[in-house]
Amino acid sequence: GLGDVYKRQNHRRFASAFGSMQTHPAYPTVEGFPEITILENDEENPSKIEEWHTDMTFKKNPPLGSILIGKIIPENGGDTMFSSLSKAYDDLSQEWKERLEEMNAIHSFEFGFKESLEEEGGRERLADALKENPPVSHPVIKQHPVTGRKVIYVNRLFTSHIEEDDSKNSILSFLFEHIHQEKFQYRFSWENNSIAFWDNRSV
């Protein structure tokens, strides 16, 4: 109805205040609002992104942030967990900080969406997304453009390997375990129409 359209217009208007919006290449969108992605997680449409991740790092210029509105909330569970990549960096030893400073990691759409691509018709459905999103390289250690704090910029879902690491991804495995420590985490519990806005450059 008109009420829903108005809410979506406000969603888009709010997001546009922080910069240009990006469309997601793999998920369905709201009719008339290509920037608004539909995320479902139920028995008919189970989530395929249960891994820790930073949104859309397979892009050369990933989005600044993501704004999610909770529309249908389960009675139990469904919380969203965030992990601070700046706190994780601060907790590294000086030796690790220096070692990682010169490293770069490959982030890949194909790697992150391998489950969807393996589904019947998946590779055909996502053919354009695959073509438009070849693997990209990002520094393992990035500096936040606003706060100046350094972050560990790798994630389980999209980071396939570190370019300079030939030890069977042992460095990447170490970083994943390090980042996901409970002391760096924040738990967000949803209610109907809750809004979560997070900084993709640091979580």
Regions found by a protein language model. Give the residues of each.
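Short, small-residue-biased leader/transition segments that mark boundaries at the very start
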Residues: 2-6
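Glycine-rich loop at the start of a catalytic domain that most often binds anionic cofactors/ligands
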Residues: 9-21
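Glycine-rich, N-terminal phosphate-binding loop and its surrounding beta-alpha-beta segment
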Residues: 24
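Active-site environment of non-heme Fe oxygenases that use a 2-His-1-carboxylate facial triad
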Residues: 27-185, 197, 201-203
